[in-house]
Amino acid sequence: IVQSSAVAPENPEILAARAAGIPVYKRSEFLGSLLAGKIGIGVAGTHGKTTTTSMIAWMLTALGRDPSYIVGGVIKGLESNAHAGSGDEFVIEADEYDRMFHGLHPQIAVITNMEHDHPDCYPTPQDYHAAFLQYAQSVKVGGVLLVCADDPAVLSLVKDLPASLTNVSYGLQSGSNYYAENIHLVDGY
């Protein structure tokens, strides 16, 4: 049984499962186990997780990679929010609520932005920052952290990272490792 943060430990079904010897896993433990043996790609951030995770899953699918993915919304063009693929990649929306993302340990982690959220879990902005720092440090050895250089809070986080963690910046600023320019919308996209 996978127990989400919304289900109390004293929930009758959880208690019955434990009494019957049925394993009960926290959502973070279960999702982390799904990434085992895969190239885990976790997307975290206060805003943009679903969009960014969807774009990565869609691109990998369009390239014929057949990734596994779990996203917080239905992906346009794939018509699903989850897929068990045969490819090497597993793309997951790395939700910070209740520190779910701490159980993931991806090969590639993305942080889109950070703005203090979920005060029930993170009473202070410093607590929120510390949680994202722990997520960033959970990247597997040899992995990479992709950070949005347009967000001051994310840039502040990068300063707290160990030098051994490879981080690559992206954004709209020319100082980023990768940046977009001359952006044109076609048909509203």
Predicted feature descriptions by range:
Residues 5-149, 153-165:
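Phosphate-binding loop of NTP-binding sites
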Residues 63, 183-189:
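Short, intrinsically disordered, charge-balanced linker/junction segments flanking boundaries
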Residues 99, 172, 183-185:
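Short polar/acidic secondary-structure junctions
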Residues 173-176, 188:
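Glycine-/charge-enriched secondary-structure boundary and capping motifs
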